[in-house]
């Protein structure tokens, strides 16, 4: 199991398209560079959920 990254943590949101061409659905991935570069942290169906997850991930008080 990966170790917890030290603070300050930084994450970024990547928009991806899932599904067959012409029938895609947009998903939002939360990614960080711990434990490896471009590690997938979580996936979310809305941009707002991804932003909320990013805030929680980066907030040391949410530990």
UniProtKB/Swiss-Prot annotation:
InterPro entries given in the database record: YaiA (IPR032303), YaiA-like_sf (IPR038462)
Domain of life according to the entry: Bacteria
Basic and acidic residues bias: start-end ranges: 51-63
Pfam families: YaiA
Stretches the record annotates as Disordered: 35-63
NCBIfam families: PRK10380.1
Record protein name field: Uncharacterized protein YaiA
Source organism of the structure: Escherichia coli (strain K12)
Gene this chain is encoded by: yaiA
């Amino acid at each position: 199991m990966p170790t917890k990254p030290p603070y300050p943590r930084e994450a970024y949101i990547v928009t991806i398209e899932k599904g067959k061409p012409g029938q895609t659905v947009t998903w939002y991935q939360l990614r960080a560079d711990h434990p490896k570069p471009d590690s997938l942290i979580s996936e979310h169906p809305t941009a707002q959920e991804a932003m909320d997850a990013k805030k929680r991930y980066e907030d040391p008080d949410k530990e």
